[in-house]
Curated annotation (Swiss-Prot):
Stated name of the protein: Rhamnulose-1-phosphate aldolase
Cofactor requirement: Zn(2+)
Family, as annotated: Belongs to the aldolase class II family. RhaD subfamily.
GO biological process, one term: pentose catabolic process
Residues bound to Zn(2+): 141, 143, 212
Role summary: Catalyzes the reversible cleavage of L-rhamnulose-1-phosphate to dihydroxyacetone phosphate (DHAP) and L-lactaldehyde.
GO MF entry, a single one: rhamnulose-1-phosphate aldolase activity
Species whose genome carries this gene: Klebsiella pneumoniae subsp. pneumoniae (strain ATCC 700721 / MGH 78578)
Amino acid sequence: MQTIIDAWFVQGMIKATSDAWLKGWDERNGGNLTLRLDEADIEPYAADFHAKPRYIALSQPMPTLANQPFIVTGSGKFFRNVQLDPAANLGVVKVDSDGAGYHILWGLTEDAVPTSELPAHFLSHSERIKLTGGKDRVIMHCHATNLIALTYVLENHSDLFTRKLWEGSTECLVVFPDGVGILPWMVPGTDEIGQATAETMQKHSLVLWPFHGVFGSGPTLDETFGLIDTAEKSAEVLVKVLSMGGMKQTITRDELIALGKRFNVQPLQSALDLYP
């Protein structure tokens, strides 16, 4: 008989967190990951739920997420340990009927709680649900090394970061034509950075936190991981190019436009118009 550990969403979280740790993006308890589920996903595993689910109030109501279940990583938990003990490091939670709080249905044992970045995740989920008609289900935050490095040497401007990442690898414009948003430095784990991230997610599926990390949104764990992985690969190329004296030639504006036409995507116009 299968248990909730065998469920696709638990196995998917195990793989995503393990892969992210192996990439070097999630040292210690760095990074967090949430996946929005349907009632039909969790209903077969009701026998595994806690007998008395703990209730935790949200710092602000999230009516868009009312009655929605999620699987989330825990606060202070190490991604490298998720595969060793999923129930201690992950949790299935369900937002209540008015969006005021949530019950921990499974996991997060020994009084553990969801990630401290839950406000940023839930606010971003709310915005991406509206923007994508419910298609986006994943929010991933990690400390992608080369993306962080670039925030120290490039002007922290959305159009510039977008253009440079598009130029760093041909596939980038196809994978994130909506570009990369970037915030000012802010204290993590607060409603303020959560709100700013969510507002930026109205325009971009990738949001950089300077000197800290990146947020990504997508329809599946694979798509969201791949989104960040693609941007991080381009950032790695750019770090190497900058260390070798900078670009001598690159993909031009006209070539980027041609690329968008070939793959039927609409590139962020302000990034295209930044320079020839």
